[in-house]
Structure formats: structure tokens, C-alpha cells
Amino acid sequence: MSSTLVRVALFCLAALGASSALAKVETEAAEQKNIGRILIAKISEEISPGDYDALLKGLRAHPGKFARKIVLLDSIGGSTAEAMRMGRLLRETGFDSLVPSTGVCQGSCVYLLAAGLKKTVKGHVAIHRPPFPAGDSAQSSRAGMPYNVAGYLSKMGVAPSLASDMQAIEPQRMKVLTAQELARYRLN
């Protein structure tokens, strides 16, 4: 096989692998009999760099006034920075957030849930400390967090104590929040 053909094959494999790492971000407008026009964004799978752009593109594809905007969440989390960017966009554009009964919102997905003007959880929400790119030491945790999680959560109307509680849970572990905890954090 020629080296050019091998390079092309490797490039195609890398492109296929990279596309599957992105969250699935879908946006569509619908007409609801009792409410009127609604805009629905669905975010599922792993949140990765590039998902903000996919969400923005989907929102721009559906201009106009809507009676209600809802983001449906079913995500295993992923990039904290990307989730916070997406969350700010959802808040600025007036979305409510919903974790349906068949959905899960874990890890960085919590930042999308927090962004909703109105937050509804029918499924499961789980939290943990995000992994630090430079390792898991105290020094790398300070160096590896270029964002203010407590400040973000506070701006979204969520109890800032969620940030410190998330930090207490190792990245490889997960804590499923109870209905009481969701209420205490103002996530439901």
C-alpha cells in the first residue's frame, strides 16, 4: 500500500473517531397546541470542544420568537469549559432545562442543567470533581481550573455549595443526587 493511501486511511479513521467524541447536539422548532412555537435543543452523549459551536449553529438556524425554549439533557458530561460556555449561551437565550425520566445528567452536564431559567429533573443527576489535565494533586487542581465554578453556579442561581461538594468527590466516582439534594442546590 502506498504511503499516501495509508495517510488518507489514517486521516479518515481519525476523523471518524473525533466526530464520535462530540456530544450529539440537535435543535428543532415545533408547534405545541396549548403553548405555541417552542424551540427544543437536545444535548446527549459526551460534551467536547466544538459542541458550543454546534449549539450556536442550531440556534441560529431557528430564528424568531418562541413561547418556550427547552434543552433536553441526557449526557455523561465531558469538557467542563465547553459545558460552561454552552450553559452561558443557553441562559442568554432563555432556555429552561429538563432531564427527562429516561435521561441522565452527570459530571459537566450539571452546568447545562444549572443554566436553565426553570430546571426540571425527572431522571438522574450525578456529580463528581472534574479531572485535572495536569494530574490530581492540589497544585495541579489550582493550575488546571481556568474557570470559576462557584461563580458560574452562583450566576445561574444554583447554590455555590454545589461547587465545593463536587470537589469532594473523586473524578472516577459518581454521586447520584437525591430529590432533597437537587432542591437544596436549586437544581429542580
Protein language model features and the residues they cover:
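Second-shell loop/turn segments in exported
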Residues: I40-I47, L72-G78, D96-T102, A134-S140, ...
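STAS-typified acidic loop motif
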Residues: L22-A54
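Extracytoplasmic/secreted envelope proteins and their assembly/folding machinery
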Residues: I40, S44, Y52-L59, A83-G87, ...
